[in-house]
Amino acid sequence: MAERTFIAIKPDGVQRGLVGEILGRFERKGFKLVGLKQITPSRALAEQHYGVHKERPFFAGLVDFITSGPVVAMVWEGDGVIASARKLIGATKPLEAEPGTIRGDLAVNIGRNVIHGSDAPETAEFEIGLWFDAAELNDWTPSDQTWRVEA
């Protein structure tokens, strides 16, 4: 199986109508969408997801923000998808993100940076398992697969 990553469009991205734009960037890159849902996360889910930041001063505000509205949770699959997705997303601080990246083009403030992406294989596995049941992930072959990747 190819590598998988967890990507979430945060409430600011959903409210600003950026879902289609962001989905399109991943599709045009050639990655395969294997899981997709819109959910308003519970506090428990948000606290688990951002647990690594629990002792940081911004933790409570981050949890409040991510639970403030709908999030579009996704699982994308493809060779090198974790590293490539991080490049597509851009730097955490939007003002440091390169033009052409999602954050570089669509965000200004670190507290409203539109999107989350797993940063490592272990993180991706944890986040996918946290946000999705195995039955919610689809194993399928796109009709244009031979035009995207070499066998």
UniProtKB/Swiss-Prot annotation:
InterPro entries in the record? NDK-like_dom, NDK-like_dom_sf, Nucleoside_diP_kinase, Nucleoside_diP_kinase_AS
Q: Which domain of life is it from?
A: Bacteria
Ligase in keyword set = no
What cofactor does this chain's UniProt record say it requires? Mg(2+)
Q: Where does this protein act, in terms of pathway?
A: Purine metabolism
* Active-site residues per Swiss-Prot or TrEMBL entry: H116
Supply the enzyme class, top level: transferase
UniProt: ATP binding residues: K10, F58, R86, T92, R103, N113
* Keyword line: ATP-binding, Cytoplasm, Kinase, Magnesium, Metal-binding, Nucleotide metabolism, Nucleotide-binding, Phosphoprotein, Transferase
Which subcellular locations apply to this protein? Cytoplasm
Q: Which reaction does it catalyse?
A: dZDP + ATP = dZTP + ADP; a 2'-deoxyribonucleoside 5'-diphosphate + ATP = a 2'-deoxyribonucleoside 5'-triphosphate + ADP; a ribonucleoside 5'-diphosphate + ATP = a ribonucleoside 5'-triphosphate + ADP
GO cellular component, alphabetical, reads:
cytoplasm
Query: What SUPFAM superfamilies does this protein's entry cite?
Result: Nucleoside diphosphate kinase, NDK
Provide one Gene Ontology biological process annotation: CTP biosynthetic process
- Would the keyword ATP-binding turn up in this protein's UniProt record? yes
Q: Which PROSITE patterns match?
A: NDPK, NDPK_LIKE
Q: Name one GO molecular function term.
A: metal ion binding
PANTHER family named in the record: NUCLEOSIDE DIPHOSPHATE KINASE
State the name under which the record lists this protein. Nucleoside diphosphate kinase
Species of provenance: Parasynechococcus marenigrum (strain WH8102)
Q: Corresponding gene?
A: ndk
